[in-house]
UniProtKB/Swiss-Prot annotation:
The active site is at C25 (phosphocysteine intermediate), H562 (tele-phosphohistidine intermediate). PROSITE patterns: PTS_EIIA_TYPE_1 (PS51093), PTS_EIIA_TYPE_1_HIS (PS00371), PTS_EIIB_TYPE_1 (PS51098), PTS_EIIB_TYPE_1_CYS (PS01035), PTS_EIIC_TYPE_1 (PS51103). It is a multi-pass membrane protein. Its EC number is 2.7.1.211. It comes from the Bacteria. One of its GO terms (cellular component) is plasma membrane. This is PTS system sucrose-specific EIIBCA component. It catalyses: N(pros)-phospho-L-histidyl-[protein](out) + sucrose = sucrose 6(G)-phosphate(in) + L-histidyl-[protein]. Keywords: Cell membrane, Kinase, Membrane, Phosphotransferase system, Sugar transport, Transferase, Transmembrane, Transmembrane helix, Transport. It comes from Pediococcus pentosaceus. It is found in: Cell membrane. It is an enzyme of class 2 (transferase).
Amino acid sequence: MNHQEVADRVLNAIGKNNIQAAAHCATRLRLVIKDESKIDQQALDDDADVKGTFETNGQYQIIIGPGDVDKVYDALIVKTGLKEVTPDDIKAVAAAGQNKNPLMDFLKVLSDIFIPIVPALVAGGLLMALNNVLTAEHLFMAKSVVEVYPGLKGIAEMINAMASAPFTFLPILLGFSATKRFGGNPYLGATMGMIMVLPSLVNGYSVATTMAAGKMVYWNVFGLHVAQAGYQGQVLPVLGVAFILATLEKFFHKHIKGAFDFTFTPMFAIVITGFLTFTIVGPVLRTVSDALTNGLVGLYNSTGWIGMGIFGLLYSAIVITGLHQTFPAIETQLLANVAKTGGSFIFPVASMANIGQGAATLAIFFATKSQKQKALTSSAGVSALLGITEPAIFGVNLKMKFPFVFAAIASGIASAFLGLFHVLSVAMGPASVIGFISIASKSIPAFMLSAVISFVVAFIPTFIYAKRTLGDDRDQVKSPAPTSTVINVNDEIISAPVTGASESLKQVNDQVFSAEIMGKGAAIVPSSDQVVAPADGVITVTYDSHHAYGIKTTAGAEILIHLGLDTVNLNGEHFTTNVQKGDTVHQGDLLGTFDIAALKAANYDPTVMLIVTNTANYANVERLKVTNVQAGEQLVALTAPAASSVAATTV
């Protein structure tokens, strides 16, 4: 690679004066761009030395690769006259450049609160769906499964009990998560949640009927009649209570010192919050919550299939804005009161939108002749059909525009069909082709037919339009000039550099590593702080941040060991190293250490990636079928190509 020329091509594509700040990590240039609309994305996509680009958190990242990215960066700095900065510095520059949006901040808060408890709600929801399958009549036969096989009655009742728990005790889950997000003690938040669902209180689901019947029980507090009402299945009151609790706790921590703080702050916070919960905050927010729920149900009932069609048409656009982050809170409220609401109309529509986007992306896969595009659309399309739409929407459909439009139209038509048959979900789950498991049993056939409509209506016009407009879009890649260096690799077994749980690179929460753009290999969730050499070789790359190592093995493999995700931002904190560039190492030699606990405490993912960066030189790179692995144990098998083809290959 000619690093000067690569830097020139990058600057030509981006604009020499269009870069506000630049840094690099082990594999990528990290840039803050003044105006991203001026970037010649096609030039970067066609550049053989650029392995990929993406934008995240205000940074435009260009994937170059270990051993080269630092040299390209140096050339870029010289050519632009920019000041060298660290990834941590550029993170601050990017954050400062992003306009604060109160609405997006609010959505982020909701997302932070609900995402941690979603697994519990999904588990309860799917168990509820299973119970529906066992107890619903006219699903498989005239009678229910339990009626035909009475021996299953006990199992169904047990499943129903387990399914009800996350929704009945929702205030405990929400109290913990919300109080933590608001900066308070989450265990005090859970305690307030327990107080709100005490068995001695009137059950939250029966409060309205109990009051209407004149049977509500009251406390007499300083002459006030305070209803002994529970808050089972409530969302908004718990969020309000958690905010007050966290605010009071921080106030008392500030004004009460020493041992008195430890003793009295929790008590004062709970007593005051509890009093406000049952006298003012709880009743008011319950009324608001009930009004919102009734309003949504009324809107659904009054607009019918037309409203569902419009919602389906706009759903993917809502995802782009981020407003969909409010939906978990709304759905939780609808599902927690399923006896009154009948279920949620949001989940079925989300499923139609995701299926439509996936179908449109797969249509591009079958229409394009570009191998690069095929690689992207195949994985993105399947992911969308399974409920993960970001790669399809942002990576393919929005860039090409017409697939997104056809997918939105398909979603609107399919959602209107859902509205005609009053299809509702009774559980949370994957909004995808397998979403039928969360649908009310009587509506499963209508849901499946709607899914087919969404797929077909999105796929066919996208495919036809793509065939007419894409033409011959085969990759036009400029091959880098060859050198006289002959590739010489041999079969080799690469050992694990750390102890931990082995997993596929595709499971890593990073779009570069998970897409195997840098090469194939393996990931390890570490349980030991020591990092050892995975094979005999020479250290080719080290970093001041000590978060990654490059090794050229004696058998020809080029290995990148990357410790954690985005850990370059730590500038070496929590890392030590025993080697430097040019050192000869033997398999098992200690390369360095990293503090796993400190990384987790700082909210960094400590997953270790072992990447074979010259994967293209091998016939096969395979992660061995292991789960837990000790440092030094076999992890990745490399198979060299036939000797004749190796000798003839140059780079």
